[in-house]
């Protein structure tokens, strides 16, 4: 005895893995024959052959099709099969003698399944009650002509169901469309007046599970003439060639899954006809026809309905495109404006944020977020910045490729409940790693009318340890208030977002190429300048030395003949030459910093400071400077360049002491992943407004009469420290001395 048990998610997942295409059961009104080629030997046949042909399966198995039907009927079929013209066979009119002089005429349809087996399906040929053979197609064309006269989709849908019902004579015809959650929605209906309406009702995804949907794509027309007919097995159940059940995916007569038959019975349906509406390889919807009693559908009428369905859906697509055209034009205008603004702005982020109405209008959103580099900019109605940061981390973990969108974010990201009023819907496009554009939509409360309680679409019973699913028995109106959902994202909105992504990526690539070309040009120019500076420095040294030597020789040889003014002039010349030599030496040093890679070695900084102090010994003694050096670490650095930095900073501390006796402190501290060194003096100090200027080559804050120098010392220091992947900065105020800091990364 079967007992009712609690329905679990695992039980429902059975619906997603059903192998209904290999069930070896067929509908009882026709015959299925599996044939072995080339002789068309019968290897399997449905067990109802006894009632239809008057011959048992045992009698027919192993015989050829030509022995069942006259050979003059089968020979042309074999010829076409040999020629690869199987589609031209369908349908083939075949007749067979059943008893005495009685004959049965069949519509024969042939196909090869996934295993390459030839399957022949035979249905008794029926004539329509009120139409000749070719009348079906004339009727379909008349229906299409009426459809072409409709101005909008709503009327178009209504005419579809009216015409299909007129063509088929079914009690009820519904146009059934799947939404973004795969639930079904009855968007049009034509029925007998005494029947309860289903128009506007929703049906849960489990009513038509994925295996069934895949079969609807393979079988654009599906007929069940008698819901109460007892399914018939194939004999034998396993094909002798493949040793497994026959794949009946393409079969017309394949029996429906027992759950679906129970579902139809619970709805009071005796016969059904289903026409698939397929768009871009996906099941867009169905034209579902129901009759309260069994109903035979002639083969010709089915083909006319299939033809009608294909043409109708091409018209639905065209109508949908027409009705969304104005909206697409509006979105395209937003996109064009944004592209223009991004191109002319300093960067694309500025181009987007300066025109929030365009950015939001592009996808019909109320809020947006731009995450690019270190920037996170919120536009319109959005979650707070911290919530958006967490959401971005979640998106990165999902490894979104092109686009991510949902109208119910909280179902997959529970924290979204906290900001449902602004972001129940999310559309996200990754621009590059760690960079996203997000659009948000608020929660919109909706009332959905279901055909029965969607939370109890199935019941489960258990018998002998086996769980069976049974569809619900009630299809009464069941209202649900849907929360935590936004309006769904339309396809044109998603395409607009992707178009913007493409524009941004192209813009970034173009700017990157321009920057790369600029960098190449700068590198070439810098190389030329460095080469010029290096050569010029060497070439200028010799004539300057000659000038200095000859001027000093002139003073020595003719000193007695020179008056005081002449001696002063000679001193000025010697001093000028000396200054020029110092400047050339500094230029040469600056050029070497760029042209020679730092020779990193494990360096004792204490020894480096001692060498710098030794080089400055004379200046220290002359100025009476007090030098205090703290404990120093060892680092990876270029010893000579590091000595130049300390020597320049100490020399500046002595030079810019003003009227005071110089006091200089030197120390080093470990800070996170770097050593930070400091040189502190008690000199004249520097106004903070000049902090950047002093590191620029040839920039001076004082005249040469006040303080001697070339204005290159700090520029050289900056170049050296940056070559070590470090930074240099200072703290100072006028009259309060200066402290220069520079960092060298640990493990440099």
Swiss-Prot record:
Its EC number is 2.7.13.3. Keywords: ATP-binding, Chromophore, Kinase, Nucleotide-binding, Phosphoprotein, Photoreceptor protein, Receptor, Sensory transduction, Transferase. GO terms for molecular function: ATP binding; identical protein binding; phosphorelay sensor kinase activity; protein histidine kinase activity; red or far-red light photoreceptor activity. CDD domains: HATPase_FilI-like, HisKA, PAS. Residues 19-86 form the PAS domain. It catalyses: ATP + protein L-histidine = ADP + protein N-phospho-L-histidine. Residues 152-320 form the GAF domain. Gene3D superfamilies: 1.10.287.130, 3.30.450.270, 3.30.450.40, Histidine kinase-like ATPase, C-terminal domain, PAS domain. Residues 535-748 form the Histidine kinase domain. Homodimer. The R form exhibits both ATP-dependent autophosphorylation and phosphotransfer to Rcp1 activities. Unlike the higher plants where Pfr is thought to be the active form. This is Phytochrome-like protein Cph1. It comes from Synechocystis sp. (strain ATCC 27184 / PCC 6803 / Kazusa). The gene is cph1.
């Amino acid at each position: 005895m079967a007992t009712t048990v609690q329905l679990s998610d695992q039980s429902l997942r059975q619906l997603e893995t059903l192998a209904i295409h290999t069930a070896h059961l067929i509908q009882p009104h026709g015959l299925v024959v599996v044939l072995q080629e080339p002789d068309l030997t019968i290897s399997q046949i449905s067990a109802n052959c006894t009632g239809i042909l008057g011959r048992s399966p045992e009698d027919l198995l192993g015989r050829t099709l030509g022995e069942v039907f006259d050979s003059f009927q089968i020979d042309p079929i074999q010829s076409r099969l040999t020629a690869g013209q199987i589609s031209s066979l369908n349908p083939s009119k075949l007749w067979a003698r059943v008893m005495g002089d009685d004959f049965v005429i069949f519509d024969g349809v042939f196909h090869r399944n996934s295993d390459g087996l030839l399957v022949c399906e035979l249905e008794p040929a029926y004539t329509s009650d009120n139409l000749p053979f070719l009348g079906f197609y004339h009727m379909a064309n008349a229906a299409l002509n009426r459809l072409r006269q409709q101005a909008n989709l709503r009327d178009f849908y209504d005419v579809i169901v009216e015409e299909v019902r007129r063509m088929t004579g079914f009690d009820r015809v519904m146009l059934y469309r799947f939404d973004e959650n795969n639930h079904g929605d009855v968007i049009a209906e034509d029925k007998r007046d005494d029947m309860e309406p289903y128009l506007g009702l929703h049906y849960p995804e489990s009513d038509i599970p994925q295996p069934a949907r895949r079969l609807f794509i393979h079988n654009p027309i599906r007929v069940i003439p008698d819901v109460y007919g007892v399914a018939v097995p194939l004999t034998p159940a396993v094909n002798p060639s493949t040793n497994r059940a026959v794949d009946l995916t393409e079969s017309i007569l394949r029996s429906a899954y027992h759950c679906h038959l129970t579902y139809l019975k619970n709805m009071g349906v005796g016969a059904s006809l289903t026409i698939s509406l397929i768009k871009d390889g996906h099941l867009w919807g169905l034209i579902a026809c129901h009759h309260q009693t069994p109903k035979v559908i002639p083969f010709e009428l089915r083909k006319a309905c299939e033809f009608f369905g294909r043409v109708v859906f091409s018209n639905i697509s065209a109508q949908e495109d027409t009705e969304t055209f104005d909206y697409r034009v509006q979105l395209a205008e937003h996109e064009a404006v944004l592209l223009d603004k991004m191109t002319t702005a300093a960067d694309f982020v500025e181009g987007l944020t300066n025109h929030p109405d365009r950015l939001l209008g592009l996808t019909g959103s109320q809020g947006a977020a731009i995450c690019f580099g270190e920037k996170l900019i919120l536009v319109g109605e959005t979650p707070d910045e911290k919530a958006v940061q967490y959401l971005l981390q979640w998106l990165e973990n999902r490894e979104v490729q092109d686009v991510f969108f949902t109208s119910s974010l909280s179902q997959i990201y529970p924290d979204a409940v906290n900001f449902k009023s602004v972001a129940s819907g999310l559309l996200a496009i990754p621009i590059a790693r760690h960079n996203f554009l997000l659009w948000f939509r608020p929660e919109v409360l909706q009332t959905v009318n279901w055909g029965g309680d969607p939370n109890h679409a199935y019941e489960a019973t258990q018998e002998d340890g086996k769980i069976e699913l049974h569809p619900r028995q009630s299809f009464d109106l069941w209202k649900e208030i849907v929360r935590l959902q936004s309006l769904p994202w339309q396809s044109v909105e998603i395409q607009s977002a992707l178009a913007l992504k493409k524009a941004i990526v192209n813009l970034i690539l173009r700017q990157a190429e321009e920057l790369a070309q600029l960098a190449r040009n700068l590198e070439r120019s810098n190389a030329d300048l460095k080469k010029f500076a290096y050569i010029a420095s060497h070439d200028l040294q010799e004539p300057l030395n000659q000038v200095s030597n000859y001027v000093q020789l002139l003073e020595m040889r003719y000193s007695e003949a020179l008056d005081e003014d002449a001696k002063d002039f000679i001193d000025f010349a010697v001093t000028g030459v000396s200054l020029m030599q110092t400047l050339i030496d500094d230029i040469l040093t600056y050029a070497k910093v760029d042209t020679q890679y730092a020779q990193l070695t494990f360096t004792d900084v204490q020894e480096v400071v001692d060498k710098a102090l030794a080089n400055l010994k004379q200046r220290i003694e002359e100025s009476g400077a007090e030098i205090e050096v703290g404990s120093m670490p060892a680092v990876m650095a270029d010893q000579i360049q590091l000595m130049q930095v300390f020597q320049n900073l100490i020399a500046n501390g002595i030079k810019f002491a003003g009227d005071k006796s110089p006091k200089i402190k030197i120390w080093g501290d470990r800070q996170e992943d770097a050593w930070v060194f400091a040189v502190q003096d008690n000199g004249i100090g520097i106004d903070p407004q000049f902090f950047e200027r002093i590191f620029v080559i040839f920039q001076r804050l004082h005249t040469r009469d006040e303080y001697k120098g070339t204005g290159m010392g700090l520029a050289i220091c900056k170049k050296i420290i940056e070559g070590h992947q470090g930074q240099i900065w200072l703290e100072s105020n006028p009259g309060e001395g200066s402290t220069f800091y520079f960092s060298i990364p640990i493990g440099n």
